[in-house]
Amino acid sequence: MAKENYVYVIGQLRKEAFVVKNKDTGRPTEGAMFLTTIRRGLYDAAGNFSPRWDKPLIRTKDPRLAKKMLEFEVNDIIEAKCCIVTHHVKKIVKCPHCETKQARESSLVYLTPVSLTLRNRPEGETAATSILMDPDVAEMSNIAHVIGRVCNEEGVKYTNDNAGHTKANYQIAVNRKFMVYGSTMDRLSTNEETQEDRADYPWVVSYGKVADDDKKQLVQGSLLYIDGYVHTQTYKQKTICDNEDCQMEFDYPCQAMQLTPYSNEYLEGCNLVESVRNLNDRVSDETMELDGE
């Protein structure tokens, strides 16, 4: 399968990075931080100024990049070249009624950086926000180029609220293009917790015309190229307390990171509509004629 798992972000650091250090040497070993990014297209369909923000988690086990995180200051504007990574984890939650701690299965989705660069060090939060709202910066503040294959059994889940708002959800399998430091692809790694597959499984959420096209063309096994951005959101998840003496329902906070396409290219195993088939045939014929000259 073709490989493309590339995410590029320019974002504002609004809170100091969390960096873990070796107890014996004091040297950084891993780090994490949130960057506030802005989506391209600062105006809505009515022409009103309407910036939209996302806050992806950046996480690394590369000591070199963890050390860089220590050097960053609040409000710094940082460039990060990354790939999207997914892990199954156990999230510890606490019942607000009986205060019992308990584990819940969860999916951790984050960006692991290949490079981190300080772009600007503005004077204060207002100046930092102004930099991000520069149209030239917003155009490239949150870019995701990913090739993946639809892997969930039910394929595309499509919803329409009958008010013109359509949405499609599906999961894709993405082969890693970059080496994730500390993974099985990193031959220097000996940490058992990092033994992982060479693919990641993010969810995709598309809207409007893209969602309509996804519904028509995608099935389980379809291969597509996504030109879009990483979309983050927070939500509440309901659960029942494990404590037999309690068993009360409660909510706990969750964070999600998904891919949202500006456009999709349907590559393989898709239900291509007739117009696309005709275009492919025409391109193929023209190529054959050129080859024959």
Report residues per predicted region.
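Short, structured beta-strand/loop micro-motifs enriched in basic residues and often containing a Trp
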Residues: 56-63, 202-209
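C-terminal end of P-loop GTPase domains and the immediately downstream helical coupling element
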Residues: 30-32
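Short, surface-exposed polybasic/aromatic micro-patch for ligand or macromolecular engagement
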Residues: 53
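Flexible glycine-rich surface loops and low-complexity tracts that mediate binding to linear polymers
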Residues: 75-90, 222-235
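The Walker A/P-loop phosphate-binding site
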Residues: 199
